[in-house]
From Swiss-Prot:
SUPFAM superfamilies: Peptide methionine sulfoxide reductase
Protein purpose: Has an important function as a repair enzyme for proteins that have been inactivated by oxidation. Catalyzes the reversible oxidation-reduction of methionine sulfoxide in proteins to methionine.
Swiss-Prot/TrEMBL GO biological process terms: cellular response to oxidative stress; protein modification process
Top enzyme class: oxidoreductase
UniProt protein name: Peptide methionine sulfoxide reductase MsrA
Gene of this entry: msrA
UniProt entry keywords in alphabetical sequence: Oxidoreductase
Active site: 16
Family: Belongs to the MsrA Met sulfoxide reductase family.
Keyword Oxidoreductase found: yes
Catalysed conversion reaction: L-methionyl-[protein] + [thioredoxin]-disulfide + H2O = L-methionyl-(S)-S-oxide-[protein] + [thioredoxin]-dithiol; [thioredoxin]-disulfide + L-methionine + H2O = L-methionine (S)-S-oxide + [thioredoxin]-dithiol
E.C. designation(s): 1.8.4.11
PANTHER family hit by this protein: MITOCHONDRIAL PEPTIDE METHIONINE SULFOXIDE REDUCTASE
Single GO cellular component term: cytoplasm
Length: 162
């Protein structure tokens, strides 16, 4: 009998990927995280290219999780709490489409859950402005450079620029 859990992926963009990755790494049931790029047209983009805002990519975190231990709905709940989804193409001082709020879905079930979650958040009364989060089908995930992986953890914690 195979005891290996069936793992799933979720991909989120919520500003600087250092902060996003650190938040999801704390979640019980998340077995791995990877900082990277998604949503653009350039293959194998570098950090410098993504920051130039000419690749179309967002900084994202790929979350590998065990759905028997943490649900996709719980990951969505966390996503909404770790950034301001009403800021268009920015988070705090980080400005540009590469810092956009985005949920990349991997399955039709994830798409449905993401849309329902966004509708619920939008009607929650938590925000004075409309939610501008993009929901899109996952495309190729490009790993960020090694120095970006678990960046804050390697430096003893901290936060991004804000």
């Amino acid at each position: 009998m195979d005891e290996t859990p069936e793992l799933e992926k979720a991909t989120f963009g919520a500003g600087c990927f250092w902060h996003v990755e650190a938040e999801f790494r704390r979640v019980s049931g998340v077995v791995a995280t990877h900082a990277g790029y998604m949503g653009g047209w350039k293959d194998h983009p570098t950090y410098e290219e993504v920051c130039s805002k000419e690749t179309g990519h967002a900084e994202v975190v790929e979350v590998v999780y065990d759905p028997a231990r943490v649900s996709y709905d719980e990951l969505l709940r966390i996503f909404w709490t770790i950034h301001d989804p009403t800021q268009l193409n920015r988070q705090g001082p980080d400005i540009g489409t590469n810092y956009r709020s985005v949920i990349f879905f991997h399955t039709p079930e994830q798409e449905q859950a993401a849309r329902l979650s966004m509708e619920k958040e939008g009607g929650s009364g938590r925000y004075s402005r409309p939610i501008v989060t993009e929901i899109a089908s996952a495309s190729a995930f490009w790993w960020a450079e090694e120095y970006h992986q678990q960046y804050l953890e390697k430096r003893g914690g901290g936060s991004c620029n804000w």
